């Protein structure tokens, strides 16, 4: 009998050693594996009506496939406190709920690790559930994680309706003001363009293309007297003699002489 027990012990010893070596190799592989960052995504805040169900949405991104080693933990930090209490844990397909009274028989799993979803539902939310919820996911070798945080506000139905009305009114007002401003700017631009075209009177095409020739003007000399004949034979006015006045300022000036015709003598017949 003793020999049989000794044989069983000798047979079990190698098997135990192999199991230990396998476990050590697995742990060593986890320690030496590449550690990559896992990103957790949650909404910043949600509003839930008192007495209804609230869903705490939590998703994550990981380059590694989820499996039995993937875990999800939820913690709660009540308003006015600095410490968080863990009240939910999910691992290997099992849900573990703590004894924290505000969440007893209220929390259910609503996620799917294959879809990288770690969400939960809370039934019959009350004012005591106001606070910050923390979603922490581990997916080895992704263990460097910044947990996601959700600020939950429990509101009464009347307050929620008032809040929604103000949101709608504010949105509609902003849209109306924006459209009014845009239409006003368009009308101002069109008005300015229309009046700028009306005020500008340019020459026609024919005027721009047709050259205008002016007859050369004869400038009398300084010593030349011009005699203008009377306009008609029946007039009693005699010939008018014009003289040129030189305004050049000197006979040797290099400037162009400017002359002016004045009446020198008016001979009339009585």
Swiss-Prot record:
Residues 1-35 form the signal peptide. SMART domains: IG, IGv. Residues 36-162 are extracellular. Residues 201-257 are annotated as: Disordered. InterPro entries: Ig-like_dom (IPR007110), Ig-like_dom_sf (IPR036179), Ig-like_fold (IPR013783), Ig_sub (IPR003599), Ig_V-set (IPR013106), Myelin_P0-rel (IPR000920). Pfam families: V-set. Residues 184-270 are cytoplasmic. Disulfide bonds join 58-135. It is found in: Membrane. The modification Phosphotyrosine is found at residues 242, 264. A motif (ITIM motif 2) lies at residues 262-267. The keyword Glycoprotein applies. Glycans are attached at residues 50, 130. Phosphorylated on tyrosine residues upon stimulation with pervanadate and concanavalin-A (ConA). Phosphorylation at Tyr-242 and Tyr-264 is required for interaction with PTPN11/SHP-2. Dephosphorylated by PTPN11/SHP-2 (in vitro). N-glycosylated. Residues 36-151 form the Ig-like V-type domain. GO terms for cellular component: plasma membrane. The modification Phosphoserine is found at residues 204, 206, 210, 221, 261. It is a single-pass type I membrane protein. Cell surface receptor, which is involved in signal transduction processes. Recruits PTPN11/SHP-2 to the cell membrane and is a putative substrate of PTPN11/SHP-2. Is a major receptor for concanavalin-A (ConA) and is involved in cellular signaling induced by ConA, which probably includes Src family tyrosine-protein kinases. May be involved in regulation of integrin-mediated cell motility. Interacts with phosphorylated PTPN11/SHP-2. PANTHER family: MYELIN P0 RELATED, MYELIN PROTEIN ZERO-LIKE PROTEIN 1. Contains 2 copies of a cytoplasmic motif that is referred to as the immunoreceptor tyrosine-based inhibitor motif (ITIM). This motif is involved in modulation of cellular responses. The phosphorylated ITIM motif can bind the SH2 domain of several SH2-containing phosphatases. Belongs to the myelin P0 protein family. This is Myelin protein zero-like protein 1. It comes from Rattus norvegicus (Rat). The lineage of its organism: Eukaryota, Metazoa, Chordata, Craniata, Vertebrata.
């Amino acid at each position: 009998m003793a020999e049989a027990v000794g044989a069983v012990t000798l047979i079990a010893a190698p098997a135990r050693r192999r199991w230990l070596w396998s476990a050590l190799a697995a742990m060593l592989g986890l320690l030496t594996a590449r550690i990559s960052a896992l990103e957790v995504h949650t909404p910043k805040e949600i509003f839930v009506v008192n007495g209804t169900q609230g869903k705490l949405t939590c998703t994550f991104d990981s380059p590694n496939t989820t499996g039995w080693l993937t875990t999800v933990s939820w913690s709660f930090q009540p308003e006015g406190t600095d410490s968080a209490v863990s009240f939910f844990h999910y691992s290997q397909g099992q849900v573990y709920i703590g004894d924290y009274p505000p969440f007893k028989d209220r929390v259910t799993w609503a996620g799917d690790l294959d879809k990288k979803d770690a969400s939960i539902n809370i039934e019959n939310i009350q004012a005591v559930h106001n606070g910050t919820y923390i979603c922490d996911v581990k997916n080895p070798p992704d263990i460097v994680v910044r947990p996601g945080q959700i600020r939950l506000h429990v509101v009464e139905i009347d307050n929620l309706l008032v809040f929604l009305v103000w949101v709608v009114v504010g949105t509609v007002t902003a849209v109306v003001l924006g459209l009014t401003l845009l239409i006003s700017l368009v009308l101002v631009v069109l008005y300015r363009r229309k009046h700028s075209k009306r005020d500008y009177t340019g020459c026609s095409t024919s005027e721009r293309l047709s050259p205008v020739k002016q007859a050369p003007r004869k400038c009398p000399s300084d010593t030349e007297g011009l005699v203008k004949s009377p306009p008609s034979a029946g007039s009693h006015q005699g010939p008018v003699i014009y003289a040129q006045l030189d305004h050049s300022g000197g006979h040797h000036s290099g400037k162009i002489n400017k002359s002016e015709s004045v009446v020198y003598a008016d001979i009339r017949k009585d």
